[in-house]
């Protein structure tokens, strides 16, 4: 009887092993796809989708606990190459706390979410970011420069789009200053 059952047992074990391998491969593939869906390939920072999700969650948290939060947009403002975009992302990541989030929104545009952060605390963080960005150089050796616009939300906005609109307004003010690197801040 064992002789007749042994091939069936071996086949069953092989099938279970094959299924286990397939499930593990599928899990690895899903984890990779989740990462690709939320991270920017070039820089390794979060992408716009991940920012929208995190900002939406922060709006809800701010509404529930009545805490302020801050957001800053960074625009490198010139046509820059991949190396400078990667360096800017690294400088931004290096100047943030573990609870903060940096995301790349466009070619040379980044946005930083500072949960439970007041305007004075956000300005301290932004000064660190600005210092890190000030060290970046273009190919010809000139400073890269950046415009930074931020908003502290004392009352949570209704939607993420309001965050984007408010930071875009601050960026426009920073660019209008005409300086190489300028920060504007507002409380909403």
Please report, for each region that a protein language model flagged, where it lies by residue.
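Short glycine- and acidic-residue-rich catalytic loops of nucleotidyl-transferase/cyclase enzymes
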Residues: 103-109, 113
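Catalytic core regions of nucleotide second-messenger enzymes
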Residues: 103-104, 133-147
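Short helix/loop segment flanking the catalytic signature motif in cyclic-nucleotide metabolism enzymes
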Residues: 80-84, 112-128
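Conserved nucleotide-binding and Mg2+-coordinating catalytic segments in signaling enzymes
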Residues: 34-53, 74-80, 86
């Amino acid at each position: 009887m064992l002789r007749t059952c042994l091939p069936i047992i071996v086949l069953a074990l092989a099938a279970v092993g094959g299924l286990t391998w397939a499930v593990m491969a599928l899990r690895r593939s899903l984890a990779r796809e989740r990462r690709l869906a939320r991270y920017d390939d070039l820089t390794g920072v979060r992408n716009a989708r991940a920012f929208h999700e995190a900002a939406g969650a922060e709006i809800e948290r701010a509404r529930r606990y009545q805490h302020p939060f801050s957001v800053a947009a960074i625009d490198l403002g010139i046509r820059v190459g991949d190396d400078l975009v990667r360096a800017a992302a690294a400088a931004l990541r290096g100047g943030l706390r573990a609870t903060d989030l940096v995301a790349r929104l466009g070619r040379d545009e980044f946005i930083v979410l500072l949960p439970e952060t007041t305007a004075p605390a956000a300005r301290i963080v932004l000064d660190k970011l600005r210092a890190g960005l000030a060290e970046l150089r273009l190919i010809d050796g000139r400073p890269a420069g950046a415009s930074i616009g931020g908003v502290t939300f004392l009352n949570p906005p209704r939607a993420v789009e309001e965050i984007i609109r408010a930071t875009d307004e601050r960026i426009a003010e920073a660019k209008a200053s005409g300086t190489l690197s300028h920060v504007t801040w507002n409380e909403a």
